[in-house]
Amino acid sequence: MSAAELARMDAVLAKQRAAFTAAMPEPASVRRDRIDRAIALLIDHQHDFAKAVSADFGHRSTDQTLMTDIMPSVGALKHAKKHFEAWSRNEKRKAMFPLGLIGAKAEVRWQPKGVVGVIAPWNFPVGMVMVPMAGILAAGNRAMIKPSEFT
């Protein structure tokens, strides 16, 4: 990777981090909207994705791509959409001894971490990006994607 490409990636990462910080805290409706848009993107362009993957492989059935890349991705996104609010609820925990004796309380507060990287292999180029994106978007994070240079 050239120095210019690295500098460009660093600039994009800095913009992603700044946008993440500026938008905090984002409501659940924003996460839901992002997941909905990812689902719509996959469904609306499923045949375009399948044709592109077939052209890259030179022999891969478009039906195989629909079954192994598109459908699992949509399923993961729908699952994340259904459960992300429960996943992000605070969880009460028992305070360590002896702090509990003096009224201490403990809980886990799930929070987005920022910008998450996704490095996808060549063999399932759509699914290996979009399935992790389900969790990334559900958690309220942003992503930088690096697809394989072979597809």
Task: Name each model feature, range by range.
Residues 1-105:
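N-terminal Rossmann-like NAD(P)+-binding subdomain of aldehyde/semialdehyde dehydrogenases
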Residues 95-151:
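Conserved small-residue-rich beta-alpha loop and adjacent elements
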